[in-house]
C-alpha cells in the first residue's frame, strides 16, 4: 500500500496528530524506535488495518529545524519546517526577555520571520520598554488578551 502525505501538528511522546493532505486529522504512531517526528514534519503515513490509528512510515527532508542541546549534549529537534516563530510573553510573571531574545535569534539563524506576542494585556501591561525596542528594530509586536478579547483579530 502506498502512503498518504501528511503533516505532524501535535506530538505526545511517540504518538502524533497528523493533518492529511485532504485536511482530515488522524492519530498516528511512528514505525520503529529510531524514527523521531516532530511538529511541522512532513511525513508519509498509512492507515493501520482494523485500527483507527495511522502509521508514519517515513519523514521527508526538513527545510529547517528549531533545535537545542539535550542533557546529554546531543541535538534535539523541537520543531521542523518552521516558516514563522512567535515568541510569547506576558506581564505576569515578569517576562524573561533573554528567552525571547533567544527565540528571535533562532528565527534569524533559520532565516524565518519572527514576531513577539504579548499576551494577557488585561493584567495591566502598560507601556513596556522591551516591546518598544523590538518594534523599533523591526519585529512585529502584537498585544492581546483572550480574557477581554482584544487584539485577537490582529493575531489571526
Positions of predicted regions on the chain:
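Structural beta-sheet core signal
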Residues: 87, 116-118
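Short, flexible, glycine/charge-rich loop motifs used to bind or transfer phosphoryl groups or to couple energy/partner
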Residues: 33, 74-76, 105, 131-132, ...
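Histidine-anchored nucleotide/phosphate-binding helix
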Residues: 98-108
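Residue-level signal for inorganic ion chemistry
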Residues: 40, 107, 119
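Canonical P-loop GTPase G-domain recognition
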Residues: 113, 120-156
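Short loop/turn elements that form and flank the Walker-type P-loop nucleotide-binding site
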Residues: 79-82, 109-112, 137-138
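Amphipathic alpha-helical interface surfaces
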Residues: 96-99, 130
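N-terminal accessory targeting/assembly segments
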Residues: 1-97
Amino acid at each position: 500500500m502506498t502512503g498518504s502525505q501528511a503533516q505532524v501538528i501535535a506530538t505526545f511522546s511517540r504518538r502524533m496528530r497528523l493533518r492529511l493532505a485532504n485536511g482530515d486529522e488522524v492519530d498516528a504512531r511512528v514505525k520503529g524506535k529510531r524514527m523521531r517526528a516532530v511538529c511541522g514534519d512532513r511525513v508519509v503515513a498509512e492507515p493501520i488495518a482494523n485500527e483507527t490509528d495511522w502509521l508514519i512510515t517515513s519523514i521527508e527532508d526538513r527545510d529547517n529545524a528549531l533545535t537545542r542541546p539535550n542533557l546529554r549534549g546531543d541535538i534535539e529537534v523541537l520543531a521542523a519546517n518552521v516558516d514563522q516563530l512567535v515568541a510569547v510573553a506576558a506581564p505576569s510573571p515578569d517576562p524573561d526577555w533573554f528567552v525571547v531574545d533567544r527565540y528571535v535569534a533562532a528565527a534569524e539563524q533559520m532565516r524565518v520571520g519572527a514576531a513577539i506576542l504579548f499576551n494577557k494585556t488585561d493584567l495591566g501591561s502598560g507601556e513596556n520598554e522591551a516591546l518598544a525596542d523590538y518594534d523599533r528594530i523591526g519585529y512585529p509586536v502584537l498585544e492581546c488578551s483572550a480574557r477581554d478579547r482584544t487584539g485577537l483579530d490582529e493575531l489571526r
